[in-house]
């Protein structure tokens, strides 16, 4: 994978189906769990942009801001398995998915790659997960 070999990203976690097919790969370039991720999907596209906030209170405040602007959260708030971060998703005016996230896992340089099962709970501990493929 170019992101790993060409750029130098380190794989933090992968998500696999029971048959072993990789459906997601989370990579890091610093101490945060991931700064880049790829997802198996039926279409070749940018999945989403993510913007980081500091903490749960920021997630709340941003959700309130979007509510006052009549922008609906279409996923979340929730907590991802890989990365253990808080999140929610909205759509921008062009229909692109935008994630706001906080409190992502901080990892040491010696952290081994983890493997997660491809299931809704992996993508959202608190509720419905958004599986890109079955």
Segments from the language model and where they lie:
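Intrinsic, low-complexity N-terminal interaction/targeting segments
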Residues: 34-37, 78
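Catalytic core of non-heme Fe(II) oxygenases with the double-stranded beta-helix
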Residues: 39-53
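Short beta-strand micro-motifs in enzyme catalytic cores
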Residues: 23-25, 47, 84-88
């Amino acid at each position: 994978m170019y992101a790993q070999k060409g750029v130098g990203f380190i794989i933090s976690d992968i998500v696999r189906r029971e048959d072993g097919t990789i459906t997601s790969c989370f990579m890091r370039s610093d101490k945060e769990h991931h700064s880049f991720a790829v997802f198996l999907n039926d279409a070749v596209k940018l999945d989403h942009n993510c913007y980081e906030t500091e903490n749960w209170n920021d997630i709340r405040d941003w959700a309130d801001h979007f509510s006052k602007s009549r922008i609906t959260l279409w996923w979340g708030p929730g907590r991802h398995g890989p990365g253990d971060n808080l999140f929610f998703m909205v759509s921008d005016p062009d229909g692109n998915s935008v994630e706001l996230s906080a409190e992502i896992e901080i990892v040491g340089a010696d952290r081994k790659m983890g493997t997660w099962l491809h299931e809704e709970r992996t993508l959202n501990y608190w509720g419905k997960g958004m599986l890109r493929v079955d």
